[in-house]
Amino acid sequence: MTMYLWLKLLAFGFAFLDTEVFVTGQSPTPSPTGLTTAKMPSVPLSSDPLPTHTTAFSPASTFERENDFSETTTSLSPDNTSTQVSPDSLDNASAFNTTGVSSVQTPHLPTHADSQTPSAGTDTQTFSGSAANAKLNPTPGSNAISDVPGERSTASTFPTDPVSPLTTTLSLAHHSSAALPARTSNTTITANTSDAYLNASETTTLSPSGSAVISTTTIATTPSKPTCDEKYANITVDYLYNKETKLFTAKLNVNENVECGNNTCTNNEVHNLTECKNASVSISHNSCTAPDKTLILDVPPGVEKFQLHDCTQVEKADTTICLKWKNIETFTCDTQNITYRFQCGNMIFDNKEIKLENLEPEHEYKCDSEILYNNHKFTNASKIIKTDFGSPGEPQIIFCRSEAAHQGVITWNPPQRSFHNFTLCYIKETEKDCLNLDKNLIKYDLQNLKPYTKYVLSLHAYIIAKVQRNGSAAMCHFTTKSAPPSQVWNMTVSMTSDNSMHVKCRPPRDRNGPHERYHLEVEAGNTLVRNESHKNCDFRVKDLQYSTDYTFKAYFHNGDYPGEPFILHHSTSYNSKALIAFLAFLIIVTSIALLVVLYKIYDLHKKRSCNLDEQQELVERDDEKQLMNVEPIHADILLETYKRKIADEGRLFLAEFQSIPRVFSKFPIKEARKPFNQNKNRYVDILPYDYNRVELSEINGDAGSNYINASYIDGFKEPRKYIAAQGPRDETVDDFWRMIWEQKATVIVMVTRCEEGNRNKCAEYWPSMEEGTRAFGDVVVKINQHKRCPDYIIQKLNIVNKKEKATGREVTHIQFTSWPDHGVPEDPHLLLKLRRRVNAFSNFFSGPIVVHCSAGVGRTGTYIGIDAMLEGLEAENKVDVYGYVVKLRRQRCLMVQVEAQYILIHQALVEYNQFGETEVNLSELHPYLHNMKKRDPPSEPSPLEAEFQRLPSYRSWRTQHIGNQEENKSKNRNSNVIPYDYNRVPLKHELEMSKESEHDSDESSDDDSDSEEPSKYINASFIMSYWKPEVMIAAQGPLKETIGDFWQMIFQRKVKVIVMLTELKHGDQEICAQYWGEGKQTYGDIEVDLKDTDKSSTYTLRVFELRHSKRKDSRTVYQYQYTNWSVEQLPAEPKELISMIQVVKQKLPQKNSSEGNKHHKSTPLLIHCRDGSQQTGIFCALLNLLESAETEEVVDIFQVVKALRKARPGMVSTFEQYQFLYDVIASTYPAQNGQVKKNNHQEDKIEFDNEVDKVKQDANCVNPLGAPEKLPEAKEQAEGSEPTSGTEGPEHSVNGPASPALNQGS
């Protein structure tokens, strides 16, 4: 046994001495069997757990003894003691292959650093689309689960750094070269290390030679308890956040439930941790020994303090994605410990903000992001972002070209990519116009282009997404076709010598063609004498005739079309070189002419009693020569021509009128001059021509029985349509009715009154209603009906002839009563209205229309001229007034006697051409109004709107000096509503006490208005009523400082009824001062006593008693305040307003009363609103329209409104007010079966008078109701017919006016 121990000790010693067989764990010399070493991967991130390690053992040493036996001993390497392997040493750990085959190097697993390494030093990374478009793939090994305690496993889309367990494979070396017979001994060695219990079991086989060979060595390890600090060295923690408590919970990632020392942890969770605070946790478990693991919990900031924000710019949103973490709240954590991480596809970025560019439009991209604090993730978010629409493609233009001078067309194919609409721009020189087109269009027609102009067209599609993106534009161009150029302008004609002219003009503003050429045509009369063309508009015309009128026409030619010529008239001068010879010749001729004239005067005086026809032959040759060549006027330029001729005090009208011979001497006048006929003529010089006089039937034994002062007059293309006659004298009344019977006339138009200005104008040739029937020779006349209207009187007569058995005939007698004593009617519409009435009674089977005034030439010719020319205007769309008046003079001398009548014909034609027929019968009103409101097409205004637009505004047509004076401006409530001077209501300072002085003052006209004191001004105007002019007053609502003037006006003008159409206030704004009070109130000299107040649902009636301080008598004034009418609106209940109007009319004087015929003395009605125009205008219009409807069963709303606008500014100023008048009248007079249904209060209004007034009067021989006083410029004395002395003899007419004053003749 002792020997055995020594042998064993000796073998152990040799083992230490044998350096060849000493093996360590890291031998630099490869084993004889070719053992290789594989280097393991690098250490993982600090956030990952440290790997488990395996202790490597050294191979056993083999000793051979000489005494033929061997022994195998296994010894531990000195390095295999209790030692913890550091991470650095693990990188160099070797792995051994026990099979003796060379090991293969372990492949390197992909890491975040392998896929994409972010650049350092920036918070934002930008990547191109080639990398961004890669598909997100899971990272291998990222989801591996470790069985080793303390290791963590976290599921994430992000790849984690791989951790490979470090393993060393040990291969034992054999140093004996011979195989000995086996002698086996079993030895077990147990060694305690820090890591494990090593149990070694060895079997020793002795060879026959006595050497011992170790054949097999088996080592078994039994694990011992590690320390808790070691076991949980790599423990990981997840932080869970509670948004309600704003506290964290730390979850310890271990497989067993551990204890946390002083801190309580439940299910491995530590609760109620505050953000950005540190907490220490001592971890222990019964599977490990002391010391415990001390874990420092570094709590991250709160999750709600971070927000993932889309920072993509909308302009780049089609190809760019931008994501950014924003800190929406502050925190105390160290921001350097925060890591932001994004993963988009297979790209990973550690940045707070990322931006991906060059992406595809309209694609979805997903990006995941997380935030780590000290390498511990505590929040994450995902975003799916769709890129915006991209810019559309470029459309393909098929063609673009000019279709005409003002039109072009472009067609195209739309782009392939999606878009919303097109934008088409067309550029002309420096001007650019763009318009949006619908996406479905592939063609567009361009209108209103400028001729012969190059247009560059640009067409692009656009799409409206987050912003509007325009696609590429397709371009094309074309040049429009040529068109006629515009007119040259600023043309001048100047004389360079007596017969030479220099003509210049400016180029046209629109040439519209390829070439430039100016042409000048020179005409003398109707003969073309020169035709020149130059490149510039500069002509020198020489060698013209002296003292000749020339017409110069200059126009521009663009190579394709001529322009409109600019026309000027100029005359050459006389030949100054022959001036002396001409003067000498003139003296001689003048002397001869003087001698001839003296001789003729002597001869005429000597032969005064000779036949007057011989005298006419002396001037016959001059009748036609003095006529002018006046062209007919087309309807389109009728108004412009009238304005041109009326300018400069009507100089052109006067020239035309004076060129017409008053009497054409070539037509003999014998019958009228015979002695037995001279007494039948009212005027000795107004006689009918023999060739067309009206011849009566002969009465046996009565010389001249076939004569009457009347002439046949041709109408427009209708021979003998009229008979123009003088007003019958008492001696010729029987002849007049004989003419009516024989000529089968059914209509008589009387354009005069029996007496005018205390002068007899015409005999009363019909019976009165009281008389009933009267015989005029053989003709018996019976009056059946008598109807009085404001401007005319219609009488229905029945005539029979005693000597004939024929039945009686109906004759309509129409007397126009509104022709003033002097001058002509101011409103030509009155004559158009008369014409409508006459034509309503005339028919195809009637004889000629008999028209007469006093002499049968002036007013008669005017009416016939208007009637005939209106027929021509309707038939040919042009009129030849001058030519027709010449024709009238050839058929009856002095027809259209004065220039004012000649102008009146033109005015009536202009009125008709501009405004047309606007009068409507009540029976036709409803279908008429229905058609007037139709829009055809819907885009155009309705006929009713067009009619309103034709209404003249009459702004500033008369002066408004008084109301605009500085001292009177404060008396106007509305500066836009100032009364015109011509019809304003003047006030007197004091009321004259005597009736005579009062009468004189009341009769004063407005002519002195301009000279009155400022205190005499009040904002009020006289308004034309239906029955007489200026019997109404339209006034503004009184101001506080004008209440006294308001009552003065009411007292001076004897107002009986006040109509108040306004409240006192509108909101907080005063619109009318309260001009009355309870009981008695004194305003200056006027005492106003409120006697009674009666309120109804529609209006309030107040009764005032007025007294003047210098008068004893009192007056009663009624005030009707209509309260259901808001400012600037229409009446809420029109029927209530109509009802009040009917009540008001009952308080006014009747139309035939003597009081109602006084002009300006009594204006019984005053209407006011806020400014005296808005509501007042509607009220006045309705009052006049109701009177017209009740009297004539017709309404003319257009003319009523036009008259109101002429009387006061702002009357019926809107279309809504205009249409309201139509609607109210239509609802007031409903139609049933084509007949107008009258209300009860109307039944007695529209009827013929069946009895004469008690005081005998010539119903048609008095002044017209309320004939207006004329302004000074209208009060011209007539130079017409003046009767001679004696009532029996004929009268004499001065042959027309000697000056261009506008006079009236007959």
Swiss-Prot record:
Residue numbers on the Extracellular membrane side: 26-577
GO molecular function, one term: protein tyrosine kinase inhibitor activity
Cleavable signal peptide: 1-25
Keywords: Cell membrane, Disease variant, Glycoprotein, Host-virus interaction, Hydrolase, Membrane, Phosphoprotein, Protein phosphatase, Repeat, SCID, Signal, Synapse, Transmembrane, Transmembrane helix
Record note on what altering C853S does: Loss of activity. Abolishes interaction with SKAP1
Residues carrying a glycan: 80, 92, 97, 186, 192, 199, 234, 262, 272, 278, 286, 337, 380, 421, 470, 490, 531
Protein known as: Receptor-type tyrosine-protein phosphatase C
